[in-house]
Amino acid sequence: MNPLKPNLNKTKLILTLFIFTLTAGCNRPASSNTTPDLFATLQASTPSNFASPQVTQPVSTPAFNFSTITPTSSSSSAQTSVPSPSSSDQPSGHIAFTCQVFKDQGSEQICLMKADGSDFKRLTTENNLRHFYPSIAPNGQSVLYSAYFADNNFEVFQLDLVDGSLDRLTSTYGVDTAPEISPDQEQLVFTHIAPATDKYQLVLADHDGGNFGNIPGINGWDPTWSPDGKAILFASDKNGTVQLYTVRLDGSKLTKITNLPAIRGRSDWSPDGQYIVTYSGEPWNRELYIMNADGSNVRQLTPSGGNSQGPSFSPDGKWVAFTAYFDHYGEDNGCEIYIIRIDGTDLRRLTDNDYCDYQPRWGP
C-alpha cells in the first residue's frame, strides 16, 4: 500500500507540532540514494567561522544524593544498586548530536565529537535544511539521522564515517525520525508520522530501508533497541499520559515500564540490559532518572537545576550523555552536552557554544 501524498499545509502543522513537542504492514517503496553533493562528507566538516568548543569542563555542583521515587513495576524482583565505577574509568567512543550552529530552528545540523569533547566535527553542511535525531551504528562506522528532503517530508539518512558516502534509507510521505540500527545491524527502527492519520507509529525496516512495516498495534515515538535486539523501548500516550513501554518486534508483550510525571520520550537502555535512563518533569525543571529495566528502583540521576534531558548510555554503560542548561539556565541558546557517571558523580560539560547542542547519542 502506497501512502497518499499529503496536504502540504497539514504536513507543515504536523511538522511544527512534532518538532516542538519532541525537541523530540505496508510495503515500503524501493529505497534510493541522495546525490552526494547535497550533504557534507567528513572532509568538509566544520566551517572555519565555527570554532571548536572548549572541552571536558568539570561543572561545580553541590553534593547530592539520589532522589528515590516510588517504583511503578509490580514485579517482586529485588531492587539492585547502581555500581560505583572507579575514578580511572574515563569516557570513550564518540557522541553524535544535533547542533544549532546558526541559532535558528530551521537549520539544525548534525555534529560529532569524541566522548571527552575533543575532535569536534560538523557532519552536515546543507545550511538551510533541518537535521535531527542522530544515532551512531553499533560498529561505529556510520551515523543515522532524520533530515528534510522534499515536500515538507523528513527521511532517514545514513552517513558513512569511513568513506563519507550518504544514503537515503526511507522514501515515504510524512516524517521519519529518531532512527536506530539494531545491535546485530540488520534492522532499523524509527518513528513515522503519517499525515493521513497524524499518528506516531513505530516502524521496522531492513538496514537498507527495505521491508518497511509498522510494529502491529503500536503507536509511539523515540524507539530504542534492547541490547539483545528482541524488544523496543519507546514512549506512548496510549493511556492518556506519556509513559515508557517495551514491546516485542511482533507487537507482543506490550509492557508499561514507568509512571513518572511529564515524560517526554527520549530514553535509553544500558548495554547490559540492566538499566533504563529517561527524563521527566515540567519545562525548565526536567531531570534524568535511572531505574531497573522493569521500571523499579527509580532514582534521580542529575543534580537539580539543569533542566536535564535526552539521555544516552555510553557503550560501556558507565556514563550517560545528555543535554542540560547548568551553565546557561533559561537561555534560548543555552543547552550544552554533558556527561555524568551512572552513580550521579563526575558531572562534566563537553560543549561550550553560543548555540544549542542537544539530542546526544553515544556510540563506539
For each predicted feature, which ranges?
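Accessible peptide chain termini
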Residues: 1-2, 117
